[in-house]
UniProtKB/Swiss-Prot annotation:
Gene3D superfamilies: Bulb-type lectin domain. Keywords: Disulfide bond, Hemagglutinin, Lectin, Mannose-binding, Repeat, Signal. This is Mannose-specific lectin 2. It comes from the Eukaryota. The keyword Signal applies. InterPro entries: Bulb-type_lectin_dom, Bulb-type_lectin_dom_sf.
């Protein structure tokens, strides 16, 4: 299991991402990707479903788009401006989140506390598919979670995992991304003791040692807010933020009313 601790210190980090097809059962949707009819995003007991009645429902999270029977063959898409849009099979817009920001790469993440949150744009990227100073070969390590939120920490061989890719805060103080063609590392092995990795509230990843001395930083500081580091299925580690929209309705999904934002 990844070792995640909530710290009171602020920090941030951001990454860019390619637009691959989303797989059913994953916990995030990237800009340009589509959740088709009967598609799911899942995280623990929470399940976001683009239902065949055209209603987007977050089960156990008490939220819905209230668009039942408003279309057929509906699809959910995240735009390059961070807006979630449901479109009918004929291409007409059925619902939108109405939360638009600057053009960039965004991620809609099903948070472990049961909220759907849109983060972006991306501010930092680790690329294991190109050669360079930080390259290193792949080796097998056990899998765990793929998300790190602002204020959370990885330490003592804690890791994020996605398919055959793993981002590990090693005990030797080196941050290593295993996978891709070349892998990646922070080149900080032996530079401190009891090191931990933290994502702050300005989109920056920071490695600190036991004395809180900064060992490494992504140097991706942005504006204050909530960010998320996603280890994607394609092997890229990307930081998105700040959060620009989230589900907030507490009423039952059985209730019917106006569109939520």
């Amino acid at each position: 299991m990844a070792k995640l601790l909530l710290f009171l210190l602020p920090a941030i980090l951001g990454l860019l991402i390619p637009r691959s097809a989303v797989a059913l059962g994953t916990n995030y949707l990237l800009s340009g990707q589509t959740l088709n009819t009967d598609g799911h995003l899942k995280n623990g007991d929470f399940d976001l479903v683009m239902q065949n009645d055209c209603n987007l429902v977050l089960y156990n999270g008490n939220w819905q788009s209230n668009t039942a029977n408003n279309g057929r063959d509906c699809k959910l898409t995240l735009t390059d401006y961070g807006e979630l849009v449901i479109k009918n099979g004929d291409g007409s817009t059925v619902w939108r989140s109405r939360a638009k920001s600057v053009k960039g790469n965004y991620a809609a993440v099903l948070h472990p506390d049961g909220r759907l949150v849109v983060f972006g744009p991306s501010v930092f990227k680790i690329d294991p598919w190109v050669p360079g100073l930080n390259s290193l070969r792949f080796r097998n390590i056990p899998f765990t979670d793929n998300l790190l939120f602002s204020g959370q920490v990885l330490y003592g061989d804690g890791r994020l995992t996605a398919k055959n890719h793993q981002l590990v805060m090693q005990g030797d103080c080196n941050l290593v991304l295993y996978g891709g063609k070349y892998g990646w590392q922070s080149n900080t092995h032996g530079n401190g003791e009891h090191c931990f990795l933290r994502l702050n509230h300005k989109g920056e990843l920071i490695i600190k040692d036991d004395d809180f001395r900064t060992i490494w930083s992504s140097s991706s500081s942005s504006k204050q807010g909530d960010y998320v580091l996603i280890l994607q299925d394609d092997g890229f580690a990307v930081i998105y933020g700040p959060a620009i929209w989230e589900t907030s309705s507490k009423r039952s999904i059985a209730d019917v009313g106006e569109d939520d934002g």
